[in-house]
Amino acid sequence: KESAAAKFERQHMDPSTSSASSSDYCNQMMQSRKMTQDRCKPVNTFVHESLADVQAVCFQKNVACKNGQSNCYQSNSAMHITDCRESGNSNYPNCVYKATQAEKHIIVACEGNPYVPVHFDGSV
């Protein structure tokens, strides 16, 4: 079974792309990263930074998670991200997404040993 840390990497990490160059980016990535298999995942964020930089966030600013848990962390610096949002004409299995690029501080939930990101909580 896929670990929570591996799932985070599959769903949110894309260090090899500096930013989403085309509107097709989300459609291709959401499909290739298997987030459109049994439904269209409505919203997903990809982070265009190194895995080491994202893992380091687990040791940065401790903040409350949206669900009230205390194991979330906000990055000290802004990171290149792409938000993929399902667009109005999307209809499973033909999932259609709109890409929005931003440079924002990310918030991730971390757990385990080693202490690594397991959930993307948001960006500010």
UniProtKB/Swiss-Prot annotation:
Pfam families: RnaseA (PF00074)
Annotated active site: H12, H119
Source organism, top-level taxon: Eukaryota
Residues bound to substrate: K7, R10, K41, P42, V43, N44, T45, K66, R85
InterPro entries: RNaseA, RNaseA-like_dom_sf, RNaseA_AS, RNaseA_domain
GO biological process, one term: defense response to Gram-positive bacterium
Keywords: Disulfide bond, Endonuclease, Hydrolase, Lyase, Nuclease, Secreted
The reaction(s) this protein catalyses: an [RNA] containing cytidine + H2O = an [RNA]-3'-cytidine-3'-phosphate + a 5'-hydroxy-ribonucleotide-3'-[RNA]; an [RNA] containing uridine + H2O = an [RNA]-3'-uridine-3'-phosphate + a 5'-hydroxy-ribonucleotide-3'-[RNA]
S-S pairs: C26-C84, C40-C95, C58-C110, C65-C72
Protein's cellular compartments: Secreted
Enzyme Commission (EC) number: 4.6.1.18
Primary location class: secreted
Tissue-level expression: Pancreas.
Disordered: annotated span: 1-24
CDD domains per the UniProt record, alphabetical: RNase_A_canonical
Biased composition (Basic and acidic residues): 1-13
One annotated Gene Ontology cellular component of this protein: extracellular region
Example of a GO MF term: ribonuclease A activity
Function as written in the Swiss-Prot or TrEMBL entry: Endonuclease that catalyzes the cleavage of RNA on the 3' side of pyrimidine nucleotides. Acts on single-stranded and double-stranded RNA.
Family classification: Belongs to the pancreatic ribonuclease family.
Subunit structure: Monomer. Interacts with and forms tight 1:1 complexes with RNH1. Dimerization of two such complexes may occur. Interaction with RNH1 inhibits this protein.
Protein name from the UniProt record: Ribonuclease pancreatic
